[in-house]
């Protein structure tokens, strides 16, 4: 195990040197490409108001204003990286997760367009691997990955301007080991709201009563010669076997929020008839097809970009791997709604399913049982 970990460590650190060398090159190239775009000075950024936000565990999202109040500001977040064992199904299957803030997925961060997101990222000395973060919402230095490589016992602070409105993936991207870290749960999402809030593309404001974040995760768990899932003492011990499974491109589990059933039963998401709910859904690695059984997507940004007018009245929407999407729905009927990846094999056999538990009065005009199931 020690030798395996040393090999992994050397690979990571060798790649880190290359990525570190790339960062100033990328920064220089970015400066040439700015053209007439005005850059704020360090003094101007330092004078901006600051807001410190405490992140919450998914599927919940920290408190935020849907319409920006005042001008741009610096929004401060802190995330601590955890390497830990998690159980991903009822059979007790274990994975050595790599988790932003200890959750799979990592927390959803919300800012407004033209705000500055400032992240303090901490890699405790109790961890064994180098980590970093690549924000798909950011510009330059590999999404920040080239500036945030931290070994155990280190921290870094990254600030970037949120220039494009939408929902975006973030993930760990250590040189030479990006896929392994991503499929070990090290990904999450950020939402950059338009300063005026969401709109339907025709001038109508869209205001949600609740927001939930669903992070879809594919796991690749090795099996032993008897077909049983293997368990390992440390992340490095699992590396070679896990990569072999990864290369088949066939996940053993596809789950929402870290485990089979994580958002079902007494952990189901909740709403009431008439409530407007925004669902943010990310998949950092594979394509997915969200579908709300018994409902619809009234307004859907399938690729997650709010400058694009939303599609309306959708039954199923397609989110490409490495992206996040958003769907806005007003619940019309009470009961249990299943929210699934409509690759039904992945939903029913591998775990990509969640529930909404909705309260309120039934509307017979929308649906009624004319004849209950009975003998002919």
Curated annotation (Swiss-Prot):
Pathway: Nitrogen metabolism; nitrate reduction (denitrification); dinitrogen from nitrate: step 2/4. SUPFAM superfamilies: Cupredoxins. Residues 34-211, 212-376 form the Plastocyanin-like domain. Binds 1 Cu(2+) ion. The Cu(2+) ion is held by residues from each of 2 monomers of the trimer. Nitrite is bound to the Cu(2+) ion site. Pseudoazurin is the physiological electron donor for the Cu-NIR in vitro. Binds 1 Cu(+) ion. The Cu(+) ion is bound within a single monomer. Predicted to be exported by the Tat system. The position of the signal peptide cleavage has been experimentally proven. Induction: Under anaerobic growth conditions and by nitrite. This is Copper-containing nitrite reductase. It comes from Alcaligenes faecalis. The lineage of its organism: Bacteria, Pseudomonadati, Pseudomonadota, Betaproteobacteria, Burkholderiales. The gene is nirK.
């Amino acid at each position: 195990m020690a030798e395996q970990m040393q090999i992994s460590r050397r690979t990571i650190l060798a790649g880190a040197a290359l990525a570190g060398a790339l960062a100033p090159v990328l920064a220089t190239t970015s400066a040439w490409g700015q053209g007439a775009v005005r850059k704020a000075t360090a003094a101007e950024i330092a004078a901006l108001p600051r807001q410190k936000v405490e992140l919450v565990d998914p599927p919940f999202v920290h408190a935020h204003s849907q319409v920006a109040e005042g001008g741009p500001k610096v929004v401060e977040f802190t995330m601590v990286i955890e390497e830990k064992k998690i159980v991903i199904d009822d059979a007790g299957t274990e994975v050595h997760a790599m988790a932003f803030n200890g959750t799979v997925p990592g927390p959803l961060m919300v800012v407004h367009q033209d705000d500055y997101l400032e992240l303090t990222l901490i890699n405790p000395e109790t961890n064994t691997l180098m980590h970093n973060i690549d924000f798909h919402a950011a510009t330059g230095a590999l999404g920040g990955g080239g500036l945030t490589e931290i070994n155990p016992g280190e921290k870094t602070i990254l600030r970037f301007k949120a220039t494009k409105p939408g929902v975006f993936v973030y993930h760990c991207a250590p040189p030479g080991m990006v896929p392994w870290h991503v499929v070990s749960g090290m990904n999450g999402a950020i939402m950059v709201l338009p300063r005026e809030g969401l709109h339907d593309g025709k001038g109508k404001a869209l205001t949600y009563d609740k927001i939930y974040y669903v992070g879809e995760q594919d796991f690749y768990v090795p099996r032993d010669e008897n077909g049983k899932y293997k368990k390992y003492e440390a992340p490095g011990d699992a590396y070679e076997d896990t990569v072999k499974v990864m290369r088949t491109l066939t996940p053993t589990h596809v789950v929402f929020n870290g485990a089979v059933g994580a958002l079902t039963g007494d952990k189901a998401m909740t709403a009431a008839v008439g409530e407007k709910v925004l669902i943010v859904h990310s998949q950092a690695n594979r394509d997915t097809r969200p579908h709300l059984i018994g409902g619809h997507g009234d307004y859907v940004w399938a690729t997650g970009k709010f400058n694009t007018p939303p599609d309306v009245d959708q039954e199923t929407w397609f989110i490409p791997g490495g992206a996040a999407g958003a769907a806005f729905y007003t619940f019309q009927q009470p009961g249990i709604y299943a929210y699934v990846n409509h690759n039904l094999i992945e939903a029913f056999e591998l775990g990509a399913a969640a529930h909404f538990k909705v309260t309120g009065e039934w509307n017979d005009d929308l649906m009624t049982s004319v004849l209950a199931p009975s003998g002919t």
